[in-house]
Amino acid sequence: MDEYEAQLVAVEQALENTTDEQQREELSTLRTNLQELLALTRETEADQTAQQGDILDDELLRLKSELNELEEAAANVGATKNKDEEQQLKDLRAKYNALVGEKCSAPHEHSWGASSYHNALICGVDDEVIINRNSELDVRLRVLYINPTHCEMLPCNYYLEGECRFDEIRCRYSHGALVPGASIKSYIPPDFPRLARNCPVLAKMPDRLWHRGRVLCANFVEQTCRVRLDGQDHKERERDFQFEELFPLITEKEDELTSEDSSSSPHDESSDEIDSDMDDLEAAHRSRMVELSLFTFKPTEKLGAWEQYTRGIGSKLMEKMGYIHGTGLGSEGRGIVTPVSAQILPQGRSLDACMELREAANGDQDYFSVERKLKREQRRQNKANEKAYARETQRTDVFSFLNGSVLGGGESRHQGDQAAKKAKTNDLQQHSTKTLNVETVRVADDIRRKQRDIAKVKQSLDRNATDIQLQKRLHMQLQSQKQELATLQAHEHRLSKEQHTRKNKMFEF
């Protein structure tokens, strides 16, 4: 529109400045066309404005009518909803009022945040209306716990008699816990046939609280149980209880089995698939761990090799927890492979002195190792055991003496005795002075012990003088004991002779 008016002004200015007749006619024609175009444009805009005003009026009227309809519908819905909620609350109250005096299983939230279910008695319905977790209307029930395990669960005796001077908040005992009606479950009666050894139970103590414990033995004839109470705050941990004072607990495994048996899951196929996937993941993880063990540094000593002297409970526990032999510690198998060896440093030495000792040993890292020390002591003990075994094999016992003296010939026996004495003398010459001293002490102890045995046999002979058969056996035993004593005394004589000979040689030297 503005463009057309600007063109019209330009044409009129051109007419005023132009003297050529032909151009003036063309400009006049153009001016006439522009004036007609402007007139038509103004008429069109006026019509469009009127039409738009009519459309807006129509839309405004329609919007007002729709708003009125919505307000009427909302009012109807609100009234209907209020009626439904009132009816629902009425039904809920009627339902819960019918449960007053019944037993149930109600939740209890402890002061540390944990929640657990306990058997309780419904004693009333609260007037307050609440919204439960499912955004539904609900009411709260006032319950008293039947098996209270904590002081805040214990019912107040004065409240039950209507004489409590404190309100619900100030009283240290329970005036009834408020729990949502939708959260209560069915009452769990005590299953007394489950009372057996190691069965977890709740036992009623004199303080009216129920304490946890385990059954040691049950007597179904007298209906009594001996229970070992948990914790260290009981002077008498083992007590006898009547069945009425016990409540058998259901463990988590039994609870899971019961829930699985009572209700069949609609997602069995999906759970089977999940289990199979978990099995596949576990198998893949185990194969990866085995593959990792092939590239792991193999120590000279097996991890847990010391358990060959024990029952190996440590390795068994590690296997149950998923440990694979040959891999490192940790869930990924990348931990240490060789165990950390214990070390004992010299007593009263500083760390600098210990480092100097290790450097003097060419930097041996196992210089203070306990295992090396134990192995060294074990080698010493093995050598001592071998020497002791050799000495025992060369000793003449009772049976060898009897066989040589009774079954052997006279001259040959004499020659054998001479050869044996010569061999023993040569054997004594090979021992050190310290070994001879130890052997002398040991032989002296054996002689004293043998003399005590002979004295006991003589006392037995005096006591059993009338029993002929026993007298014969005791005489034979006494003779053998005397022969052994003679052998020991001869051995002691050879030892003392050898020691005396060495002493004389030292004097001569």
From Swiss-Prot:
Cellular component annotations (GO), alphabetically ordered? nucleus
Among its keywords, does the record have Zinc?
yes
> Zn finger regions (C3H1-type) covering which residues?
155-178
The principal location of this protein is nucleus
Gene Ontology MF terms in the entry: DNA-binding transcription repressor activity, RNA polymerase II-specific; RNA polymerase II cis-regulatory region sequence-specific DNA binding; zinc ion binding
The record's Pfam families line, in alphabetical order, gives: G-patch (PF01585)
Identify the domain of life: Eukaryota
Keywords annotated in UniProt: DNA-binding, Metal-binding, Nucleus, Repressor, Transcription, Transcription regulation, Zinc, Zinc-finger
Q: Provide ranges: composition bias, Basic and acidic residues.
A: 411-420
PROSITE patterns (alphabetical): G_PATCH, ZF_C3H1
Segments carrying the region annotation (Disordered) are: 254-277, 407-430
Tell me which residues make up the G-patch domain.
Answer: 310-356
From the Swiss-Prot or TrEMBL record, state where the protein is found. Nucleus
| Functional summary from the UniProt entry | Transcription repressor.
In its UniProt entry, what is this protein called? Zinc finger CCCH-type with G patch domain-containing protein
